[in-house]
Curated annotation (Swiss-Prot):
GO cellular component, one term: plasma membrane
Subcellular location, principal: membrane
Keywords from the UniProt entry: Cell inner membrane, Cell membrane, Ion channel, Ion transport, Membrane, Transmembrane, Transmembrane helix, Transport
Family from the record: Belongs to the MscL family.
Transmembrane stretches, start-end: 8-28, 38-58, 85-105
A GO molecular-function annotation: mechanosensitive monoatomic ion channel activity
UniProt name for this protein: Large-conductance mechanosensitive channel
Amino acid sequence: MIKEFKKFIMKGSILDMAVGLVIGAAFTKIVNSFVDDILMPPIGMILSGIDFSNIFIVIKKGTDTLGNYNSIEAARNAGAVVIGIGVFINAIISFIITALSLFIIIKLFNKIQEKTVKKEKDEKESKEKVCPYCYSSININAVKCPNCTSDLDVK
């Protein structure tokens, strides 16, 4: 059972997935920091100094009977039930940036992969010709077809 587990873990796809998860988690932290620390503060400043992370609705007041909370953390610490609209907006923006970034990365990767496959195909085609008798693909230097054994014209 341990040997099977080692074999399973050492498969390339499992290792690729693990690396992808680690890189994805790091990338998510970078995007979240970009949204929270770089993108949203100027947008909040343009919109009359709004801090999006502190936009919230109190559904039920907490232990503080006044219910005037300066931040979502203060409301939650007081035991209030809140809907964190601003935090949700930040999460949506982070998701959109992450999805767009991944889309661009995958598109570039696919384009590079297509060029590589096309180059390999062109190289393969330049090393082969078609037998005029059986229409099999054969080496360009062949003087006799290995499939139908016909003699070929040498050019």
